[in-house]
């Protein structure tokens, strides 16, 4: 009798699982269909941070943030384009965006150029790809930042954070974080988030961030997070802020 009850409980759990994940898959599939099948393509700007003479963060074993940013961004671009998105990159090679004549305020000029590209593109939303660093090597995990006065930015950040936890690191307890000071967040005319994929200052996470397999995994889950956003999911939340950019 106990064995029969156990089997029935297991079957019930399996049915519920199929229903739950089936509905989730259907919602995502519908979002993909809408994104690729409509008369007007969704337009996305992907912004791989840093580049050229600006390496960004440097990992404990020498992994450069600019390289990881670009690799993840290119994989993400391929995922989005495969589903019919129009994708504009602020950079698709290892280059900075300031002019060769610039002698001072190169960082400011670089960021201003990125905003100029976004403004001209008129995207539906913007995905900035970065890696995190911190003085304490114990910190790890992806975290998504959004402009504090942007409801759509908060919703996008929520979708991405949830998917990065579910698909990349279930032990990650970070939540989306609002910010009012980051140049890109406060100057973008479109909903924008900064995706900090992980900490280069954490030995174990840096080792993963430097591999193509993990970069592809990050890109895929960022892509899935955008699908949830397009489908109307997500809500804003706030948490403890860590160092970014």
Predicted regions and their residues:
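Catalytic-site microenvironment of enzymes
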Residues: 1-245
């Amino acid at each position: 009798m106990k064995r029969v009850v156990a089997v029935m409980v297991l079957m019930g759990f399996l049915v519920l699982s199929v229903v739950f994940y089936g509905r989730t898959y259907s919602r995502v599939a519908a979002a993909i269909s809408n994104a690729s099948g409509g008369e007007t393509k969704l337009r996305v700007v992907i912004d791989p941070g840093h580049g050229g003479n600006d390496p960004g963060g440097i990992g404990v074993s020498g992994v450069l943030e600019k390289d990881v940013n670009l690799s993840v961004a290119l994989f993400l671009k391929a995922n989005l384009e495969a589903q019919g998105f129009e994708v504009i990159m602020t950079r698709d090679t290892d280059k900075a965006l300031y002019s060769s004549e610039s002698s001072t305020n190169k960082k400011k000029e670089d960021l201003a150029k990125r905003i100029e590209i976004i403004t001209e593109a008129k995207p539906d939303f913007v995905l900035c790809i970065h890696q995190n660093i911190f003085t304490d090597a114990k910190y790890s995990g992806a975290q998504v930042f959004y402009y504090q006065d942007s409801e759509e930015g908060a919703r996008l950040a929520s979708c991405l954070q949830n998917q990065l936890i579910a698909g990349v690191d279930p032990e990650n307890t970070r939540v989306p974080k609002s910010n009012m000071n980051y140049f890109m967040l406060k100057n973008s005319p479109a909903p924008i988030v900064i995706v900090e994929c992980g900490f280069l200052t954490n030995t174990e996470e840096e080792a993963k961030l430097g591999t193509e397999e993990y970069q592809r995994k990050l890109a895929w889950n960022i892509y899935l997070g955008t699908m949830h956003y397009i489908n109307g999911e997500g809500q804003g939340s706030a948490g403890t802020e860590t160092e970014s950019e």
